[in-house]
Amino acid sequence: MRAKWRKKRMRRLKRKRRKMRQRSK
């Protein structure tokens, strides 16, 4: 269960990073 949550959190972080990159552009 914990591993699943971690994966979900990582995915969300990755998504946020992508958005930040676009904002910088």
UniProtKB/Swiss-Prot annotation:
Signal peptide: none
Compartments where found: Cytoplasm
GO biological process terms on file: cytoplasmic translation; translation
GO cellular component: cytoplasm; cytosol; cytosolic large ribosomal subunit; endoplasmic reticulum
Cross-referenced Pfam families: Ribosomal_L41 (PF05162)
Region entry Disordered, spans: 1-25
InterPro entries in the cross-refs: Ribosomal_eS32
One GO MF term: RNA binding
Main location: cytoplasm
Subunit structure: Component of the small ribosomal subunit.
Protein name: Small ribosomal subunit protein eS32
Gene name in the database record: RPL41
